[in-house]
Amino acid sequence: EERFPMMSTFKVLLCGAVLSRVDAGQEQLGRRIHYSQNDLVEYSPVTEKHLTDGMTVRELCSAAITKSDNTAANLLLTTIGGPKELTAFLHNMGDHVTRHDSWEPELNEAIPNDERDTTMPAAMATTLRKLLTGELLTLASRQQLIDWMEADKVAGPLLRSALPAGWFIADKSGAGKRG
């Protein structure tokens, strides 16, 4: 099976890891995180508006998934211990294929034949199934993750326009410098 760069699709996995920490009592969705202009990276449409007041962990997850905010993702990565800890979280849930190595925006480089920040379709599908329908997260956390994905504002409108009436979609797209 071929490896593919994750690009921003990793943000769902990241917020799943954050929610797992919330469920374990190691994090609080209402905790406010303050950051500075120096923390902002390319494409941060939500976090750039909250330099003075900061954002809660819940707001950062929402920004990361629904608007693909890169600074939000980096701040959340910091809360779990960085890229290596996200990979460790995935390994602990049985995904030994997916690897997350970089911070935003470097992870979007997608250099051919480079396994950094990649996964395989079957591994991603299995991991998403475990996060969204399995017992890894509490029911409340699973529903929160689904709610964020249903509210995706990046690719969601395009995908939703093709759905039959009454159908819904929960998604997280990703694109990089090489497509």
Please place each PLM-identified region on the residue numbering.
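Acidic helix-start/capping segments at beta-turn-to-alpha-helix junctions
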Residues: L29-V46, I80-G81, W148
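Active-site SXXK
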Residues: P5-I33, A64
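Active-site-proximal alpha-helical segments within enzyme catalytic domains
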Residues: T9-V12, E115-E150
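Conserved catalytic neighborhood of penicillin-recognizing serine enzymes
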Residues: L40-L76, P83, D114-D117, P121
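Extracytoplasmic
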Residues: E1, P5-T9, Q28-G30, L90-D95, ...
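Short, well-structured active-site flanking segments
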Residues: S20-D39, T87, T138-R142
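Short, Gly/Ser/Thr-enriched beta-strand-loop segments that form substrate-interacting elements
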Residues: G156-G179
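Mid-domain, small-residue-enriched loop/turn segments at the edges of structured enzyme/sensor domains
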Residues: N74-T133
